[in-house]
Amino acid sequence: MSVRQNRFFLRVLTCLGIACVVPPGAGKPGPALAAAVPASHANVALQRIGVAPNHRGFLRIPSRRPFYPWGFNYGNHGRLIEDFWDTHWSTVVRDFHNMRELGANVVRVHLQYGKFMLAPDKPNPISFKLLSRLLRLAEKDRLYLDLTGLACYRVSDIPKWYNAMNDRQRRKAQENFWRDIAATCAGSHAVFCYDLINEPVVPGSRRKPGQWQPKSSFGGYDFLQFITLNPGRTRRTEVAVQWINAMTRAIRSRDKQTLITVGLLPWIPKWGWLSGFVPRIIGPHVSFISIHIYPRTGKLNQAMEVLRRCAVGKPVVIEETFPLSCSAAEEQKFLLASRTTACGWLGHYDGLTLQDYRKLSREHRLTIGEAIYRSFEQMFVKLKPDFVRRQPARH
């Protein structure tokens, strides 16, 4: 089973409530996890995040204090935020508070194109109003947002007119999306970065009209997306750079400062996807490198090889990681080893806290998926002191 299928499998298990045999005491946190995170925080305004002068990390501006992204990709019981934020805003408020209490300083939110655009040049006012509300919530909880856009994870949420577009039309529509997002967010320091698209791919040859997804879906979701159907004779890496530059120009027309990145698939043949987005080539065109790495049992060396390929003179953030294809101990080993290259780390949150998992375990109702989420949250709390360091910024 592939890493991508494992991710879907986890969601299916969680949603279906398939039980696992997990003794109530299994995975019980030790003393390091028992310490409660402070329930309240000083009312200090968020500062803008920028790249450190040595290009190896991030700084808060203007204080120049170092900033280490440490947080979660946000979901709630397998749902996307647009599935419930208009009708159950209190769930978003609770989850953001809980992620902060677990020690997060960054939350990655995936914005579905079809929920934000009613037409190629017509934004959905309801979704943009909710995005503004999300910015205010993040500012209140002092959580930074990794806003990942152009998401087309569910076929049912993709407008037919969007998939019917040719390359030129679709790129223009994507530029409109990012221009509107940037115009909404430019005044808020709560935005850590704009992630232009999740796991983009440049095809090696011409694709049929409408085939913007690579048919890698499982359980109704597809996290990959082609950025062109007809690369022609242009090198795949050049197509990637041209696309990044087009989206960046759209953003910079409204927001001159917020960091920009792209959520990358691993760029080694052993991992099955050669996307055309090569870190050393796109590096000069983004603020930092974002990579998605799910270590595999017995193959930590491959995960580290992926990470080393990202060391191209820009900060490196592991934007997605989780013990899907390995044990929690192996995931922890990878995270600790990754500090030689990475300066930011985001796992996954799905709506429950350690207290919730303990209750489910006592009641013998903990599912396989929930047990995996619990193991990651335990690790997340335990490792934070080693990852969110306090030393002065390096110049």
Where are these regions (language model features)?
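Bacterial N-terminal signal peptides
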Residues: R11-P23
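Signal peptide processing junction and immediate N-terminal pro/mature segment
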Residues: P23-A36
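P-loop/Walker A phosphate-binding loop and immediately adjacent motor/lid segment at beta-alpha junctions
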Residues: Q257, N301-L324
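Active-site mouth of glycoside hydrolases
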Residues: N43-F288, G298, T321, S325-C326, ...
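Short beta-strand-loop-alpha-helix junction that forms the active-site gateway
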Residues: Y294
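Bacterial N-terminal signal peptides that target proteins for export
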Residues: S2-L13
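Substrate-binding cleft of secreted/luminal carbohydrate-active enzymes
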Residues: P315-H395
